Amino acid sequence: MGTPWRKRKGIAGPGLPNLSCALVLCLSRSQPRTQVGTMSPAIALAFLPLVVTLLVRYRHYFRLLVGTVLLRSLRDCLSGLRIEERAFSYVLTHALPGDPGHILTTLDHWSSHCEYLSHMGPVKGQILMRLVEEKAPACVLELGTYCGYSTLLIAQALPPGGRLLTVERDPRTAAVAEKLIRLAGFDEHMVELIVGSSEEVIPCLRTQYQLSRADLVLLIHRPRCYLRDLQLLEAHALLPAGATVLADHVLFPGAPRFLQYAKSCGRYRCRLYHTGLPDFPAIKDGIAQLTYAGPG
């Protein structure tokens, strides 16, 4: 990306093998020679400007794909560690124990300069912390702990005596988050990590975890599960009137069914904070803020 397009050796040029001719020969077995031989090069040339335009226009998405899928998978195989585990090793050697702010800054630096972490990031983080401080919730439920980044943001902003329950479905990821949370200085009485899928945990919150109401909920796991989990919270009467539900990644990768439900059911006041992805500001995303009016 960003470099001039050049002809590849072997594609065109006098005296050089033409790869398109090989394609023509293969296709000519099933199609008339005159039709294939005259149309294939023309079609290829016609589509070339379109391909180049798409690559330029969506270069940020291409970089994200390479960084989060291809390079990450390669590093996972070579190191035997997941990206969250590599990030935690970096935190251990560069961050100050007991200082959640410094740990968060260290994770931001890791994501910007080492490997993209797919975390909430500082811009969205400021929105989250401001809302937690503003609402002063007695109990917060987070669905999707991941590496623990947003968990630390919430824990920092909780009022005295506040409680945070955070749910992570992957045991290996949860183990990393648990160590990060304790490294930051938050004990189990303040921040409790539950390992399990949100679909299984939500129905058990009242009986097994003594959570009768969640004043603030953060949805930050899989956007396609947001609507299901919101309806589960409603069905089990875990949202009091006035409760705040925050949902990340509602624009990218997007949660259209969740947003449509929140806007049309008549039980929520909705607001959308437009942001970009951390380290990819050109890719537009947003945080949805829902205020629950009650079951009526």
Curated annotation (Swiss-Prot):
GO terms for cellular component: apical part of cell; cytoplasm; endoplasmic reticulum; membrane. The keyword Endoplasmic reticulum applies. It catalyses: a catechol + S-adenosyl-L-methionine = a guaiacol + S-adenosyl-L-homocysteine + H(+). Its EC number is 2.1.1.6. PROSITE patterns: SAM_OMT_I (PS51682). The keyword Transferase applies. The chain crosses the membrane at residues 36-56. Keywords: Catecholamine metabolism, Cytoplasm, Deafness, Endoplasmic reticulum, Hearing, Membrane, Methyltransferase, Neurotransmitter degradation, S-adenosyl-L-methionine, Transferase, Transmembrane, Transmembrane helix. One of its GO terms (molecular function) is catechol O-methyltransferase activity. S-adenosyl-L-methionine binds at residues 142, 144-145, 150, 168, 198. Signal peptide: none annotated. GO terms for biological process: catecholamine catabolic process; developmental process; dopamine metabolic process; methylation; sensory perception of sound. It comes from the Eukaryota. Catalyzes the O-methylation, and thereby the inactivation, of catecholamine neurotransmitters and catechol hormones. Required for auditory function. Component of the cochlear hair cell's mechanotransduction (MET) machinery. Involved in the assembly of the asymmetric tip-link MET complex. Required for transportation of TMC1 and TMC2 proteins into the mechanically sensitive stereocilia of the hair cells. The function in MET is independent of the enzymatic activity. Interacts with LHFPL5, PCDH15, TMC1, TMC2 and TMIE. Interacts directly with TMC1. The interaction of TOMT with TMC1 and TMC2 is required for the transportation of TMC1/2 into the stereocilia of hair cells. Belongs to the class I-like SAM-binding methyltransferase superfamily. Cation-dependent O-methyltransferase family. LRRC51 and TOMT were originally considered as alternative reading frames, LRTOMT1 and LRTOMT2 of the same LRTOMT gene in primates. This is Transmembrane O-methyltransferase. It comes from Macaca mulatta. The gene is TOMT.
